[in-house]
Design a protein with these regions (language model features):
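Glycine-rich N-terminal segment of FAD-binding domains in flavoprotein oxidoreductases
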Residues: 435
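Extracellular beta-rich repeat passengers
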Residues: 1-151, 156-432, 440-465, 469-524
Length: 524
């Protein structure tokens, strides 16, 4: 139904991946350090947020900036790098970025002078008409941030931002996105200032995965680089994955680099890569090309980086004809660069892999991307365990196959149920979070005789226990063997056909048994 709060008389329609600018965004302003210089190169220390200004806003302190939208420090608010602007956790921000003026839109999440006392984690921004998230100075730290199909930069940094960030994920919009990151050091009248009051942006970024709009995209006149450096930007980017951008890996403006460093990053496909010279993915002044942290003067990777064009090994990755990503499992395969190449120490959370994802897909369960079916669950271990053959024995007392004893099924293996298994009294079957179990059935060629059917199932008898305690991010999955075959693209011997899959759909049932738990409480 139509609601009275919008300006039309139409119910909906529901926004899509292409739809942005339908409302504003979320803006948080604090009193931590920002770098905004005057014409003499001295840091002013505060600024007014871009986006919109209410007509009734008042400048009480006479600094030319209306007070309600100021951020940073001044005579009213002392500098507080531990500023606490609140908590934003498990929040999805969708279809915002209202255009308040020609070329002036609102970011999905804007953080102006926000300090380390603020919690920003597990946040998603989808299809925003401007940047996904922008840091204007401040010291705030973030983790588990996802940007999907935003129409400008995914991660924008400016004005002396110095936070520490881990587990950033970006998928660019193929028709209007700019860079994965637009990263600036300082703003104001004298960006080259050497005044001691000016500290340029120098964040620490670990475990990012940036996916571009695809190398053949033609619908946008914007940058389509993994990231752009400007205004003396300094940072340290480590243990990250950058892939499938139409232009350069790094674009650097003439005054862009201000102490930038990087190590142990996987460099994927880029439109500018000529197939032979790693330096072709750098769109930068000669000074940066000569001393860049990625490749030597002869183009050899240094500081643990890969060659350009390295496959990041995503477990699933498909696009439609318009360039939109339609399916991704960003967890890398076990033999891929993000899994096997070295990582740098020092990240806030230990992660023995490059990029934003290891075994756990933290997008599942709470994001728009998952709800829309864009997040595939295609990473499966290589080791298969035939439970009937290896973990059960015939029990003469019960006349069935029971577990040989209490056991734990671990997430680094696949468990195959070719028939019923029983957990009898005093036995405990423990299943780790993230474990996948696949069942089969075999009617032995006698469709009308059910007595000889073999049906994968788990039956917990009285006195036995099943401890299957999954998590939001690592659920335990029981499924049909056809799903495993579809993911691997090969037929397995445990079912009765010679076909790989096909993957079951919402209409498909009856492919295995189920889960049965029997207790000894009162029944009537």
């Amino acid at each position: 139904e139509d609601h009275p709060w919008d300006v039309d008389a139409v119910a909906g329609p529901g926004p899509t991946r292409e739809t942005g600018g339908l409302w504003g965004g979320l803006i948080m302003l604090g009193s931590a350090y920002i770098a905004h210089t005057d014409s003499n190169g001295v840091n002013i220390g505060n600024n007014i947020i871009e986006g919109f200004l209410p007509a009734t806003a008042v400048d009480n302190d006479g600094d030319g900036r209306d007070d309600i939208l100021e951020y940073g420090f001044d005579e009213t608010f002392a500098r507080d790098d531990a500023d606490n602007s609140g908590v934003v956790r498990y929040v999805s921000i969708r279809h915002g970025g209202y255009e308040v003026g020609d070329g002036n839109e609102i970011n999905g999440l804007t953080l102006g002078g926000v300090g380390t006392g603020t919690v920003i984690e597990h946040v998603e921004v989808v299809s925003n008409q401007d940047d996904g998230i922008e840091f204007f100075g401040g010291t705030v730290n973030t983790s588990y941030i996802s940007m999907m199909f935003n129409q400008d930069d995914s991660f924008d940094i400016d004005e002396g931002h110095t936070g520490t960030h881990q587990f950033w994920f970006a998928v660019q919009n193929p028709n209007s996105a700019d860079n994965g990151g637009e990263w600036d050091g300082v703003t104001g009248g004298s960006k080259s200032s050497t005044d001691a009051s000016v500290t340029r942006s120098a964040p620490q970024i670990y475990n990012a995965t940036f996916v571009g709009a695809g190398p053949g995209i033609t619908g946008s006149d914007k940058g389509n680089n993994a990231f752009l450096l400007d205004d003396y930007f300094a940072a340290n980017v480590q243990n990250s994955v950058f892939h499938d951008f139409a232009e350069a890996f790094v674009e650097v403006k003439s005054d862009g680099e201000g102490g930038f460093s990087a190590s142990n990053n996987t460099i994927g496909a880029f439109g500018d890569y000529d197939g032979a010279n790693n330096g072709s993915v750098l769109d930068a002044p000669v000074e940066f090309v000569v001393s860049n942290p990625f490749f030597s003067a002869t183009g050899t990777p240094i500081n643990g980086h890969t060659n350009a064009g390295t496959d990041p090994g995503f477990s699933a990755y498909t696009r439609d004809g318009s360039g939109y990503l339609t399916s991704i499992d960003p967890r890398p395969a076990t033999d891929s660069s993000p899994r096997t190449d070295d990582v740098s120490a020092g990240a806030p959370a230990a992660a023995a892999y490059r990029g934003a994802f290891g075994d756990t897909n933290w997008l599942l369960g709470w994001t728009w991307a998952d709800a829309q079916g864009l997040v595939a669950d295609a990473l499966v271990p290589a080791t298969d365990v035939d439970v009937i053959a290896s973990q059960t024995a015939f029990d003469a007392f019960y006349g069935v196959n029971v577990l040989t004893g209490s056991t734990t099924w671990t997430s680094d293996k696949i468990y195959i149920l070719t028939d019923r298994i029983y957990v009898k009294e005093d036995q405990v079957l423990t299943i780790e979070p993230g474990t996948k179990v696949y069942g089969t059935f075999d009617d032995n060629g006698t469709a009308g005789n059910f007595s000889d059917d073999k049906v994968g199932a788990v039956i917990v008898a009285r006195g036995g226990q099943l401890v299957a305690d999954g998590t939001l991010e690592a659920p335990i999955v029981f499924d049909a063997i056809q799903s495993l075959e579809a993911v691997r693209g090969e037929d397995h011997p445990w079912d009765v056909d010679a076909v790989a899959g096909p993957a079951p759909t919402r209409e498909t049932g009856g492919l295995w048994g189920g889960l049965i738990v029997l207790g000894r409480a009162c029944i009537a």
